[in-house]
Amino acid sequence: MRKKIGILTSGGDCPGLNCVIRAVVSHATLTYDWEVFGIPYATQGLLERQAIALNMHGWDLRGIDPLLNMGGTILGTINKGDTLAHVDEMLASYEALALDALIVIGGDGSLGILHELASRGNWNLVAIPKTIDSDVALTERAVGFDTAVNTIVDALNRLTFTAASHDRVMIVEVMGRSAGHLALHAGIAGGADVILIPEISYTISGLCQYIAELRDRWQRKFAIVVVAEGAKLCLEDVQENIASACVSPKCGRGQYIAEQIARCSKNLIDTRVSVLGHIQRGGIPSALDRLTATVFGKTAVDLVAQGKFGQMVAWQNGEAIPVPIQDVVAQSPLHVNPQGSLVQSARCLGIYVGEKT
């Protein structure tokens, strides 16, 4: 009897998800002659017992070829709602679908929820990491991160010239509430002067002094500041009320920093803020994300064939390997190492990356 496996995408979208789907459908069909069913809109589709045959409905082996360069996910996804409030219904729905295994593509949050459901229902689960934040533990790669970095670098390339033309400080706010990998990688690669991330606190005085030094010592009248949305002020600044109402995470970090630079310079420094927002989640997947997604999808199918469940496909030392999902969940989110090579390299290049401890 042919195996029947399901696949779903969960959490925020990112480039490369369709590449994973393409690899799973191709390998499962060509190599193992299995049936592959897509679960639309993650746990919502699971709850509603929806399953789309991915070797039919236009997504057969010929139909999945365009997925290689498509952003987003053809299956749809959700990143809201209290899934664990419907555990019993979810478990019953999974049983009704009669799947031999389920391949899930998600970030640290959605993987934790799906692992919990799988543990309660004894599901045959295999996971694939995707995140533009690169904060999933135990893997050196995750689908979507490389494209997001390239998207930010492209924006920095464009904004640098307009900043230089007007002698402005250009502040670029990027995603990263709890981990600063995206800001750090893109900031270094994009030639930023300042990179502010959640893991290393900064001071307004230190930031303003650095920008003043660029102007006075190096005759640089423009600057590029990359700030993660979760960048944190030093505790002393918060306690002294320097941050005012903008200490709240609801206040945009980029706008707050622009206001503080204007205050410190007595409005002599012209600032502009660009919040990249969901542009970072879109776009055509990079070559590296396509390769990562393809290898991850193929490996996930092989793990199902080998009966190795409760595993996430990870990239370590140049190879795709299985690691226990429970270990990934326990160690996520993965934070930037403040003493790591990237932070040290940034500082050696003269980039302000917050205060040294």
Swiss-Prot record:
Q: Cofactor(s) for this protein?
A: Mg(2+)
Q: What residues bind ATP, as annotated? A: 12, 80-81, 107-110
Q: Where in the cell is it found?
A: Cytoplasm
Sites annotated Important for substrate specificity: 109
Q: Which GO terms describe its molecular function?
A: 6-phosphofructokinase activity; AMP binding; ATP binding; diphosphate-fructose-6-phosphate 1-phosphotransferase activity; fructose-6-phosphate binding; identical protein binding; metal ion binding; monosaccharide binding
Task: Give the metabolic or biological pathway.
Answer: Carbohydrate degradation; glycolysis; D-glyceraldehyde 3-phosphate and glycerone phosphate from D-glucose: step 3/4
State the GO CC annotations.
6-phosphofructokinase complex
Under the heading InterPro entries, the entry gives: ATP_PFK (IPR022953), ATP_PFK_prok-type (IPR012003), Phosphofructokinase_CS (IPR015912), Phosphofructokinase_dom (IPR000023), Phosphofructokinase_III (IPR012829), PKF_sf (IPR035966)
Query: Where does this protein hold substrate?
Result: 131-133, 168, 175-177, 229, 272, 278-281
Q: Which reaction is this enzyme known to catalyze?
A: beta-D-fructose 6-phosphate + ATP = beta-D-fructose 1,6-bisphosphate + ADP + H(+)
Active site, UniProt feature: 133
GO term, biological process aspect, one = fructose 1,6-bisphosphate metabolic process
Please provide the record's keywords in A-Z order.
ATP-binding, Cytoplasm, Glycolysis, Kinase, Magnesium, Metal-binding, Nucleotide-binding, Transferase
Q: What is its EC number?
A: 2.7.1.11
Homology family? Belongs to the phosphofructokinase type A (PFKA) family. Mixed-substrate PFK group III subfamily.
What is the purpose of this protein? Answer: Catalyzes the phosphorylation of D-fructose 6-phosphate to fructose 1,6-bisphosphate by ATP, the first committing step of glycolysis.
| Subunit structure of this chain's protein | Homodimer or homotetramer.
Protein name, per record: ATP-dependent 6-phosphofructokinase
Provenance organism: Trichormus variabilis (strain ATCC 29413 / PCC 7937) (Anabaena variabilis)
